[in-house]
């Protein structure tokens, strides 16, 4: 009778238990960084436009017919609420947050994400969120203008 050491076999492929735990800790630490949180905010907003089209197309073919306006409204709520979750920890006076914003997200595309999110929260009359996002938007605009002047 031969007894196989499965952990040893899978270890040959780089899947050791210790390695997995280390990677999980690294990923958890990454999720707490300003760069990651800003990136998740941006990705959710930008991908929401594609998601919206796909969702509406899918439900338009359903039987019985569903109210596409309600589906669109629910989808927007989910996207922008979740996107805000990722950016709500932004600290205006934090060097770490400002540096992540300046180095990775001070461009027109990120500015578009902020504007879309501000417009959504204006439509739902959540003005505190709008004011918070406007401060970040102002920093992005300042960084964009500074980068233009350096060129």
Go through each PLM region and give its residues.
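Long, low-complexity, acidic Ser/Pro- and Gly-enriched intrinsically disordered regions
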Residues: 2-122, 138-151
């Amino acid at each position: 009778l031969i007894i196989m050491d499965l952990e040893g076999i899978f270890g040959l492929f780089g899947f050791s238990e210790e390695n997995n735990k280390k990677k999980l800790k690294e990923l958890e630490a990454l999720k707490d960084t300003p760069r990651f949180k800003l990136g998740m905010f941006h990705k959710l907003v930008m991908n929401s436009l594609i998601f919206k089209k796909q969702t509406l197309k899918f439900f338009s073919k359903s039987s019985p017919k569903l109210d596409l306006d309600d589906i669109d409204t629910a989808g927007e709520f989910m996207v922008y609420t979740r996107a805000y979750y990722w950016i709500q920890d932004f600290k205006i006076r934090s060097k770490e947050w400002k540096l992540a914003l300046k180095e990775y997200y001070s461009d027109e595309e990120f500015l578009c994400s902020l504007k879309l999110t501000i417009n959504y929260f204006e439509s739902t009359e959540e003005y505190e969120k709008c004011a918070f996002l406007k401060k970040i938007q102002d920093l992005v605009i300042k960084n964009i203008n500074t980068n233009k002047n350096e060129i």
